[in-house]
Amino acid sequence: MSQNLNWDEIIKKEARGIENYDLGEVHAVESDTVVTKKGVLDKDKFYLPKSFVEAFDGHNLRFRITKEEAQKYRRD
């Protein structure tokens, strides 16, 4: 999936994991990483590998990652 995606289109879109886990909003796209921010005051940032992208429906970017797995990619 990741090769066919126009990465510019996903900025400011919602990011979701397995079981609709909220990964926040896409903030940036780097060479092999998608950066998301979640929260209002205390923002968690997730640095997720592009290879985990499963689908994009125009509104939500879906990742093949569970809530527990996502914590490995979380930074403050």
Ranges and model annotations:
Residues 1-76:
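Peripheral interaction segments used for macromolecular assembly
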